[in-house]
Structures are given as structure tokens and as C-alpha cells.
């Protein structure tokens, strides 16, 4: 089920948490009803989710105090610049594996705390909670009994120390974020409670949680050190399993937790591209060059050569390996021979060029992939001359 995206200001991206919850519950009930018809039982469920997307809600009522600020959102760009001027980047990166960027949850939390109408009141009464989408869904499914997350999601907040597996008190202090609003961090496979019977009709245990990109790598069986998955959806994300050893990239890739089992981390290197399928959405919904996403494949294959038109889809800044939140989109190479199809093709090709940058960074870090597994959840078949 698709839910609406909101763009209240330039560079801002939001979701309605209640829509996230209602569509999730609708999908779950559909599966439960199907299982009943087949006379089967659902033994357990797992959750995979957008990782950095940030929600704060009222502990007593369960109502969000602001819309979910989505991972693509850029509103905290100036605050991130301030943190960099204070020379926090190296310290933050050594602890969290991340660069200071609006992409991650920490500065989004800070923004809601500073701008939410009832943030201070709820903090004072200990009635304010934070969570990424997994935490919010667990809270709702268990009817407020569990305030939990797991390691792969926690590692994307820019608040979690991936060396000692704890919320980092020094970073929290520097950002003035109270630890009491943060969830407990569990293993990726663990006891996350049970769904409330009044909500789902049956009690079902929740026994696994994993961030969406880590989950995609797990689903592609990237269990061996050096195995890579490259996923193309709204954004595009390349993850390499680096095993139990944390590797720090010299070429601006992220060091992150792949998963944690039995209190032991498996780490990964990740390159994040903010605009992949979202570029196709832009072609369809904003500039109206196509009516359906599927048209991009036919158009991209209609010509064997690029006619010199290039799109830099920095609609939400640039992710790895550039980390330029201030970057903006560019179309270049237009001539009188160029037409709308040139722009469509160039937008699709841009995903291939960005992917090359990520693989090139891994190569420069001296990391040789054992195998690359690519999967697309959108219409992003690259033209024949686009080499990754």
C-alpha cells in the first residue's frame, strides 16, 4: 500500500505516521485473513523499515507530535554545517561510522524538539518518545507495551556508538537530546513482544527487525565477507558485508551495523544514493514527462547512444561519496536536437553513474567484492551502454 509524501517546503520531505500505521495494519490484517482461509497459523512476524525516518510521539496517547521527517529531508542542513564548524565530524564518525548529514535521525530529532509545539511539555512529564519507523510500529502493534529498536536501525541515528553498542552520551549531550526518549536496542533477531489481540485479532510474536537496506542484503544471502547487494528503489544503496571487523572507509563510504546476533555485530560498508526511483517519480509527478513509471524502460532502450544530455539528480543533495547536502539538481548538454526523451533517459542513466562512483570508492578502499547481487524495486532498467 502506497502512502502520500508531503513536501511542505523546499528540501523538506514528510510522511504522516498515522498513514504509515494504517497501511501497515491493513496489510497485516490482509495476510492474517489469508492465513485463516488457508487454515494456517502465523507463528511470527518480522519488520523491515526506512531507517533514518524520524517520529516523535506522545507516550500516553500514542499520537505523533509532528509528521515523520523522512530520510531524504534536508531541513537540518544549516545545523549540520554548524556541527562541522565545531569540529565534531571526526569524533562522530569514529563513534557512529556516519558523516554529519541531514540524512540521519539525530538532527531531525533535534529539529522536532526545538520546533514541536508540545515537545518541552511532554519532555517535562516524561511522556515523549522517539523512534525510527520500526520502533513506532512495534509500539503500535503491542499497544504501547514495547519501546524497542535493534542495532541496524540504531546505527543510522548518528547517536549510537557502534563500537560499544550503546547510545553515546557525549553525542547526546552535544546535541541536547535526552536519552530518556530513546528506545532500548536489541539484537536483530530477538523478542520484540507480541501483537495486541485487540488490534490484530490474534497474538503474534515479533521476533526479527532489520533496517530496509540491511534486510535486502540479508534477503540476497550476502552472508559471506565481501558479498555485496546493490538495491534500486526510491534511492539506491550498495552494502558490502565486512564481517565482524569494523572497516573505516578512506573514500567517504559509511561504516554501519549490518546485523547483530547473540550480541555480536556484523558490520558493513555502505554507499547511499538519495535519488534513484525517486527520479522516475519526479519525471512522472513533477515535470509530467511520463504518465507511468514503466515508460522509462521503453524510452531508455529506444536509443543505443547517449545524445550528450546528463542529469545530476541532486534533488536532496548528494550522498556518497560526495556528502554535499547543499548540492542541487542539474540538467546539462541540451541542444536543439534534445527532446523530453533525452531527459528521461539521462535521469535513468544517472543511477548507473552514481552506482559506479560507489563501486569505485569500494575499489579504492582496497575492498574486492566476492559477488554483487543487484535488485530493483522500480522501473530502472539501465540503457545498454551504461556500465556499472
What residues fall within each predicted segment?
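Active-site core segments that coordinate phosphate-bearing ligands/cofactors
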Residues: 77, 84-98, 103-147, 158-169, ...
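N-terminally biased helix-coil "hinge/interface" segments that flank
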Residues: 1-2, 20, 24, 28, ...
